[in-house]
Every structure is written in structure tokens, then in C-alpha cells.
Amino acid sequence: MTENIKTGTIGVNIGDLFPLIKKFLYSNHEIFIREVVSNAVDAMTKMKAVASGDDSAIEDYSEDDLKVRVSLDEENGILTVSDRGIGMTADEVEKYINQVAFSGMSDFIEKYKDTANTGIGHFGLGFYSTFMVGKTVEIVTRSYKEGSKTVHWTCAGTPEFQLEETNDEHQIGTDIIIHLNLEDEEIKNDFNSKDKIRDLLKKYCRFMPFPVIFGKKQKWDSSLGKNIDTDEDDDITIEALWNRRPADVTDDEYKKFYHELYPGNEEPMLWIHLYASDPIDLRGILFFPKTRDKNFFIHRDGISLYSKNVFVTDDMKGIELVPDYMQLLFGVIDTDVELNVSRSYLQNSGQIKKVSQYIVKKVCDKLKSILTEDRKKFEDGWDDIRSFINYGFISDSEKFYERAKEFAMFKDTDGKYFTFDEYRTLIEANQKDKDDNLVYLYATDVDSQTTYIETAKDKGYSVLIFNEQALDVLALQTLEQKFEKSTFKRVDSDVISRLIDKGDDAGVKFNERQEEVLRESFMSRLEGQHGKFFNVTFADLGKDSLPVIVSQSEWGRRMKDNSKFQSNSLFMRMGDIYTLTLNTASPLVSHLASDLLSETEEKLKPIQDDIDEKDKVIKEINEKLKDIKFEDQTEEQKKERQDAEEAVQKARQKKQEVYKDNAADNKIISQIIDVALLSAGILKGDALNKFLKRTVEFIK
């Protein structure tokens, strides 16, 4: 039963809509099938994500139902695409369907014209491609949200629409019902045919992550002399199986080929066309996908192997034809090597090794030529190919490094690019330590490590930017082995004077008592903070620098970074260890040390006298027993030493308690610690809230 009917005008001039779509998005009408199915897949992807939290909260949910079902009523010219995705409420239909143009359709098209062909349609915009073939389009949908009603939207290819909320029964999900414009002979011939729709689905949707069902599978019925439907759904989706030989093509054809193989991906950064007949016949196209800001992942099925256009495998694991690091690429390799489906045969073939060596050589030669001939293009694409280069360094450090060192690059925090030789020349004069080691400083996050980066720059040092997801941190270990007398240090792993130790001992130093009172006072406040472990050190950072900085050792960070690529790693389960370095040149820290000494002097004097006396006793005992082996000492002698050591330990604990009690309510210590933790991105939650309140109090 209809509860509410709304009519209105779509937020776009329909006369302007089709020319814009044709100009920017759809070179031919058949692309609408991809857009509609992609929207359905997108809706089910969201449903799966929602259900992963608590699928019992979703009515009649079953992951087995996550399928796109496509049907065609040839008699009436009605094409329906149904999904079991998240569906839409009336408000969502209003937002995503009726209000396509937020500030004008032209602006919307302009914003997305470069990405609109990436496979997953922009719901609303991709949906409107259906009007290229349909004279009327309906949406019947029900949201997964509790209490949602069925929504029915209708538009006849004009700015007017009708939107209804009903109590009609409808499963969660969406039906897109396209009434084909059969008055157009081209549309009638191209789209009102089950065979042609099936071909289009195979062309555009065969690699979708959910089943795409089009009718039923058929079998031959000899008694009827024809094929008849079975009860089994005809799922047109398959593994990444393609059967298209490479040929000399234009850039646009390369891109189109790539999108046919991998619908939904961004355009590739570059591609390499393999073409050889000696020493072995080899054809293929390898694409470098855009990988910046994405998690590292080896696509084992990214490269498909063919032999004379016959599919062999898309699982390259264990096959020496393609090194592991090449499996970051996408594409097709076609060779006439005598192949057998046996995995061991592939692994042991001498011809396979020759093919592999040729592929690596051609890829490296191509990258080197791009750097030489069009450096800007290479630099623009570097962030997309760096994972490939870095993984090559890690997995094949000897052979691959010798080729890749000619074109591999560093990027600094200012966004400038350098070859290895260029960068060494840049820093060689200024970034050597007292032992003549060249120190490469690097950061992994410019925003969170700004303080450390600027401190290094103030010293005239250059800082590289490494992307942890791009395997930079793992690759640098290989580079350290290859670069003569060189080391890489993360810019926030220590104070700059220790990162590049020039052997200069000049600077403000604290005496033993100052260091002790500060160390014990700060450690008493840091103990157990934020689930981290801390130690306190001292260094002259300059009187204009922060009073304190927090760092994590290079070794600790590397172990942690390495563990990201290892399952169940010990280092992933270990707590982080940080160093808090107090600036001895800071007037604030110096005054704080004086205040703490003054505040604790009276209570500490008798305790320190007691410690000195007990240390004297231990020294006398050790002197008395120095010539007696431990196993030859009497139980009485052992107990005498043990009691003396326990006594001095208890006295030291009393001393620590004095420091702890005195520092407990010291707002200056709290503020200094929190400023350091905040700059390191550690201060969060309740601790951050307390810091902000304390800061306001200081201002008052």
C-alpha cells in the first residue's frame, strides 16, 4: 500500500545531462551495464561490511544471497538488475538520485571526469547512464536499516520523477528496472537480446567480486531437440581469465585493454610491451598500477600466463617465470615455451628462467629509458612504482639492485626527487658523523614529525620521506648493505646531535645530582603511561628548542616495521619503548632541576647519608670476601652480603619515593611530559583532555 507519493523535478537539466555524459563518461551506450552492476556490487560490498559487525541485526541476511541478478524480458523490453545490498531509504534516493547536481551538473561532471571510468560508478551519476537505453527507469529499493519501507522511484527520461514509500513486501536491496526504448532500432537490436546482454555482462562484469547471475544454465534435451534451462543459476563471473593477444596499440587502447582486464582500477602509471622471438618467443603487456597511499599487497593473480593464447595459470606462486616483486604488476604474458600444468615442471624449466631474466631486463631497461627521456614523467610516477622497486631490492637484492640503482630514486620532505648518486653528492659534505659514516635521515610522516624535521633542517641537513606502506623501511636495510659506510636513521629516533654524532662534546651539561633528580622525578610520572615504556636522557638541544622531545630508537622502530609483514610477530606484541630527552640548554629545565633539588634536599639528606653508610658496609664486605670463591663462602658470609645489599636497596627505594611524592603534583613536569607526548602523537584520550584543561589553567 502506498503511504506517501512525492513528485518533483530532478536537480539537473535533462537536456544538458545526456551530452555531458556522452562527452565525458560514455563513449558508447553499452557501458551502462557496467555502471548499474557496479553500483549493485558497491551496495553489496557495503552490506558485507555492515554485516561483518553483526549480521544478526540485518533482516534475513545471508552472505550467500550477495549476488547480482540480471534478467531480460524480451517480449516487453524490460531489463532488471537486482542486488541484495544495503538498499536505500526515501531520503537516500532523494539525495543520491534526485539531487545529482549539488552546484550544477557541469561542475559535477568536471569534478569526476578523470575517474568516472574506473568501474565503480558514482551512485546517481552512473545510474543516469541507464537513460541512454531506457525510456523509463524504475528503482524499487528497501534499506537494511531497521524499520525501512519499500521505496519506488520512477522517471520517464524527463526532469519529472515520482517517489513513493510503500508497505509492499520487498527484500532488502535494490532493483533497477529499465524499460528499453524499443522505438530506437539501434537500442532494440543491441540490448533487447539475451545473447547480447550475456556478452556484455561477460565483457564488463566477469571479474566482479560477487556472482552476477543471468538466467539459468542450459542443457541439451534430445527429446525436444533443443537446449532447456536447468535449475542452476548461470553465473557469468569467472577468475581473471582473458584471452586476448597483445599487439601494437595506441595509448588509449592500452588503457582500454587495462580496464577490460581490471575494471574498477585507476588508469595505470605506465606499461611495458614485451615482444621477442629470440632466444624465446615472448609476447605480453605489463602494467604498473597506481599504488600510492595503498597497502602493500602481492596480487598473485595480477599477471596471467598464456601459452599460444591458451590460459595456463594466474597463480604465479612458485613459478620462476615471474619473480615475486613482479607480481605487484598486472597484465598478460604469452610464451611458446613448452608448458605443462605441472607446477614442478614450470619451476625447473631452463627456458622459464630465460623468460624470467628477459622480463626483468626489459622492465628495468624501460624504466631507465623513461628516466632518461622524460624525467618529469618518471618523477610523477615514482610514488606508484616505488613498492615494486623496493620489493625487488628486498627479494632479489643482488641482481635487481645492480639494474635498479640506475633509476631508483629518493624523495625528500620538500617533494624533490634524486637518484641515488645525486642524493649522495648532496649530503656527502654535511651529513657524515665522527666515524666518517654517511647518515641518511628519513621521516615517514611529515605532519607528525614536523618538529624533528625542522630541527634537522636547522642544522643544514636533508631529510628523506619514506612511505611505510611502500616497503621503504624494509628496503633501506638492503641499501645500507649496498651503500658504502652509510646508515639510515629515522629523524625522530633520537636527538639530532646523536643521530649525526660529530664528536663535539661542547654544550650545557648537568651534574650528577641534577640528572638524578630530573630522571627520577620524570620516570615516576612516566611509569605505565599510555601502555608505553620510557627512559630519560639528557642533551643540549639549544636554548631556543623545546625543553623535551620523545623518540623511539631506530632499532626498535625497524623491528616494529618489519613485524607488520610477519604474522604473529613477537615485536608486534611488545610494548613500545620511548626515550624522553630533556634539553639541558633549556632555562625551563634548568630552573626545574634547581627547584626539585631544593624541594627534596631536606628529606633526601638523611636517606642519602644512610645509603652512603650502607654502601660503605657493602664495600667492606666485598673487600673481605674478594679472595674467596662464591661456592666456598659460608652461608653466614653469603647472608651478610645479601642483607647488606637488600638494606641499601630499601634505602634507595625510599629515595625514589621522595622523588615520586614530590613530583606527583608538579604541574610543570606534567606539562613538559604532555607537550613531548603530544608532539610525538602519543597523547590521546583522557590524558589529552587533562593536558588541555591544565593548559587553560596556566593561561589564566
Regions found by a protein language model. Name each.
Residues G119, V137-E160, T166, N181-K700:
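GHKL/Bergerat-fold ATPase module in large chromosome/replication-associated machines
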